[in-house]
């Protein structure tokens, strides 16, 4: 259906037929229409059921309560902000409900909107520059929070120099940037000192490979 769609409505119908896997599908046509749909057959459990844990398959109490109509799937069709994007980030709530999923942190999505929002005259060169952008809009905010909890009177000269570098950092990750190295080492040591003693070395190593750790 998607391959033979002749209109936005045809394409949307094709997307609605995808029960699994859950995908972010982008659409654009020569008429200026843009759209984004999240695919997948979504469902609801009874209140109190947490699908992140092992459920009771015998009682029926933990079974799926209902499957939702495709109209309840997260989407944006010709939005007022005139563009669509996805960085596999958490969509906004629908009917007051945030759909669970293995989403990525907001870093890329936040940077994408930061670049797209103020500009409307995009061309090939501008898009190419955005594709290779390596700036985090989240990391500098994290740095502010970290520094606010540091007793700077007890720091060595080298540590004070590191803080100065971080304070001046705008979030870029260029080849010769020193700040990203300091930042990532600080984050690693923070996580290590917080979690490794509870998780153990092996589980902590596994924990570092998940997206959960990026959202702390």
Regions inferred by a protein language model and the residue ranges of each:
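Bilobed periplasmic-binding protein-like "clamshell/Venus-flytrap" ligand-binding domains
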Residues: 21-27
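Alpha/propeptide regions of enzymes that mature by internal proteolysis
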Residues: 2-19
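Long, compositionally biased non-active-site segments enriched in small/hydrophobic residues and glycine
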Residues: 29-216
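Short solvent-exposed loop/turn micro-motifs enriched in small/polar/acidic residues
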Residues: 18-20, 68-69
